[in-house]
Amino acid sequence: MRPVSKIERTVAPFEVVSPYQPSGDQPAAIAELDRRIRAGEKDVVLLGATGTGKSATTAWMIEKLQRPTLVMAPNKTLAAQLANEFRELLPNNAVEYFVSYYDYYQPEAYVPQSDTYIEKDSSINEEVERLRHSATNSLLTRRDVVVVASVSCIYGLGTPQEYVDRMVPLRVGDEVDRDDLLRRFVDIQYTRNDLAFTRGTFRVRGDTIEIFPVYEELAVRIEMFGDEIEALSTLHPLTGEIISDDQHLYVFPASHYVAGPERLERAANDIEKELGERLTELEKQGKLLEAQRLRMRTTYDLEMLRQIGSCSGVENYSMHFDGREPGSPPNTLLDYFPDDFLLVIDESHVTVPQIGAMYEGDASRKRTLVDHGFRLPSALDNRPLKWEEFQERIGQAVYLSATPGKYELSRGDGFVEQIIRPTGLIDPEVVVKPTEGQIDDLVHEIRKRTEKDERVLVTTLTKKMAEDLTDYFLELGIQVRYLHSDVDTLRRVELLRELRAGEYDVLVGINLLREGLDLPEVSLVAILDADKEGFLRSGTSLIQTIGRAARNVSGQVHMYADKITPAMEKAIDETNRRREKQVAYNKEKGIDPQPLRKKINDIVAQIAREDIDTEQLLGSGYRQAKDGKGAKAPVPSLGGKAAAKGAKSAKGKAKETVPTDRPAAKLAEEIEELTNRMRAAAADLQFEIAARLRDEVSEMKKELRQMKEAGLA
């Protein structure tokens, strides 16, 4: 039993809120999943075609089972998309987002061939870190929790029991020494700052203490009368407005890696002991340089730990802080869940192999560091879970995929199928065309689509070909972008949003246009060199790529090939099987396929529960959407000029429209006002807000230039 299973959590029912009811294959799939899980089956596979509503089916399944759930996705982009969907479907429950908090991460490494040591370098996204803390906080305080996570959830996270033991419970009427309370806040890594009140800090004003938990958008006020807690309240950190009066609150540590003084000293002693043993071993092997290197580095780290409680690369000593035996698995997010949690693995054909590969990739780099005296052997225990350890920590699992892998299919007793789309949308028609003249044919097809305000995805085999093709399209005046591995995660999400919004028409990529991308505006997927067998043109890859056109009524897939390979045949046959089943269902029910209408949301903005003062900072440029707790969460919208522009032309091409709904002088004033707001937001460290304001200012400046060129200014 997990230690945290004994913790009392608030119990509230999972409840799906949706204007739609299960339809198509969904009712049967939900009932069968519910039956199998309740019957105790450990592994269940849901083979769900693209666009059949697997996310909604999962939400209804969670509603039936009423169990805390971990949903794993293969990357941050899909995790964000899933979290948005679950937030909409389960607005009254805690839907959390747990991914790596690094915007940039260069791991510590050593290259023996060139004697090059690369120091660890990273940049942490504070908002994502808050969301990680919010996830663990929800898991330890309530049962109605769905956490959407990337593979980051199998990496070490600190001991949940220590995290719980060091939390500070606050209750009205409790007797507590004020100075002792302040010391406890410092012990759990909160910083006193009476001037700048930000997350992870507290301030003291007479008998009033205010603390801003790292996992919240709101702060907590503690009013003392002598040594008694007289009142507790939740307040807005900027305005000071009281949001609620409370009787009982918890303050969790500001770090998942919190350690008390006694634990710190024990860890330091263990590190010293290991250092002595390792130095003896290296000296016996004649590795004097490595021994000296290790002695200098570790002694410096020990001094830092004893003086300030932390050091650079402290995670490499996690085995000693956790009190684990060498080789034992680390604590991870999985250990924060109660025993009966349910695991859902989305796009399992990608995610399952990814989980299995994490350990070896991490270990090979660290072995080199240990062998050359840069780290103690215990650094190898700061690692992700091995596949066997992961399996030991999960109970029942549901695997979701349009193309389940061999592992998933071998585990379950057959699969639950969900092929029919409630919207009546039919799988795209697959057309095989010769490679001769393929680019000219593709240009012709692109022009046909852009005339109808539809989008196109083009997938190539090599980065060079994708770059050359993008350049060629640009020369022809086609609005095109190139999605590649060098584009960071958040920019990748933004590129997909821009494609849907019509800011360009064609997206060219290699292996980034597959699993889970939800793009209803795409009516054509072009697969170049479809007959070149390999990983990118396997049957599974082709079925996934074909699925990108399955959300559009007039969806088509053009495969450019000179022969039909077994992989192509498999993909085409499976697509035709699904088409026939959907056509028969539509005919039986009298359904006319309807286009999928889906809001074009800013995924990155929606995933975070933004500050309540966003509305004041941004004014009317943003509409408001309620989150599950009734607090307002801003959703970016095109206001004023952008709305007019977007309504007239979804393309967003500057030359097509020059809005004239306000004079240039008024527009210039608005630009100046928004610029001032942008600078103020940046000064207050509200960087997400500042970035959105910057984009809006950029659009308005572009409009002003158009007005001047048209002689309207």
UniProtKB/Swiss-Prot annotation:
Keyword annotations: ATP-binding, Cytoplasm, DNA damage, DNA excision, DNA repair, Excision nuclease, Nucleotide-binding, SOS response
Give the residue ranges of motif Beta-hairpin.
101-124
Q: What is its main location?
A: cytoplasm
List the InterPro entries.
Helicase/UvrB_N (IPR006935), Helicase_ATP-bd (IPR014001), Helicase_C-like (IPR001650), P-loop_NTPase (IPR027417), UVR_dom (IPR001943), UVR_dom_sf (IPR036876), UvrB (IPR004807), UvrB_inter (IPR041471)
- Give me the stretches of Basic and acidic residues compositional bias: 653-663
**Quaternary form?**
Forms a heterotetramer with UvrA during the search for lesions. Interacts with UvrC in an incision complex.
Q: What is this protein called?
A: UvrABC system protein B
Q: Which organism is it from?
A: Streptomyces avermitilis (strain ATCC 31267 / DSM 46492 / JCM 5070 / NBRC 14893 / NCIMB 12804 / NRRL 8165 / MA-4680)
